[in-house]
Amino acid sequence: MIRPRFALLAACLLLTGCGSGAVASTGHAPGAPADPGTPTTSAAVASSPAVTPSPEMSAQGAPLNLPGLGPKTRAQVPADARQAVVVTGRGKNSPRSTVVLYRRTAEGWHADATWPAHNALKGWSDHHMGNDLRSPIGVYGLTDAGGLLADPGTRLPYHHSHGFVSPGTGFEGEPLAGSFDYVVAINYNRKPGTTPLDWTRPLGAKRGGGIWFHVDHGGPTHGCVSISERHMKDLLRALDPALHPIAVMGDAKSLAR
């Protein structure tokens, strides 16, 4: 039985941030959707602007800093973060991006997985607002998860609820059903330690919210980052609260600042 309160909250998320609830307006022609089941190739990564700084390497050959981040972005990375999900957009106005899961050891940062992804329809923003159809640039904690389907084996707190519904169609006419089968809340304008469906907005409702990692539906989102269902399960199983995981997200040029 769907609990009305959580179903209403999920519907609100669709309108304000988590990117799946609106039919595309005419006049938009976003790029072709990513193939969520195909690993990212070096050619795809090379399509990003060549602005990424060269990372310092440890004696063991691992980067000492997260690759692609400039000093401004690196300064936002907490000292205790030992797991990072880096989302690098192909351009400031592009809905296509690449997700790399990193783990920090004594030798440096190691890339454990690379996945194709979608972000918001209009790309990225340094000052995200509700309904601007851009994903927020920044560094955010990853503390809470949930979904319509049962916990696949994550170590994060997991809220299994029928409130994670995603009706309707996306910007390219694709069905949104199943988009919220698995989600990880990105701690932009939300209260950490609560269900992803929680409606607390510390920056105010106008700044949007409900920014999640969720299952890809084959097109751009309202503000979230989406990857294939298989990769969402991989992400959920990999994230470890003891490693203080974070999301680092933005277009390549912005992250390199």
Where are these regions (language model features)?
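Extracellularly exposed regions in secreted/surface proteins, prominently low-complexity, repeat-rich
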Residues: 211-212, 218-257
